[in-house]
Amino acid sequence: MITAKFYQKPSQGSIHMTLKGHANAAPKGEDLVCASATMLAYTVAQAVQFLDEQGMLKKKPKISLKEGSATIIATPTEEGYAMVLHTFWVAQCGIHVLQHNYPQNVQLEHLKV
């Protein structure tokens, strides 16, 4: 099962996304549920890098993308907060759809906004 978590650490001003595990909906290389979750993680990672290049982050984002694991942490500036939060929220919406359609393969812990 893929476990997805989206959360904030107000004391650090950071927004987090983590994915762990495998969907196991099909054999490796054929699992569309896993591929969908992976694509969402890669999209957030790229968007966060673009936001950093545009000066919307206080510091470089932390991005770790490995087989069965993804962690993305962004610390937005005051001006960039809404854009960064929206980026993570859109990915959370995608994971929500996956969880709704494949509840046996995906579990989501929602970002509180």
Each model region followed by its residue ranges:
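Short, conserved glycine- and acidic-residue-centered signature motifs
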Residues: 33-37
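N-terminal intrinsically disordered, cationic/polar leader segments
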Residues: 1-32, 42, 46-113
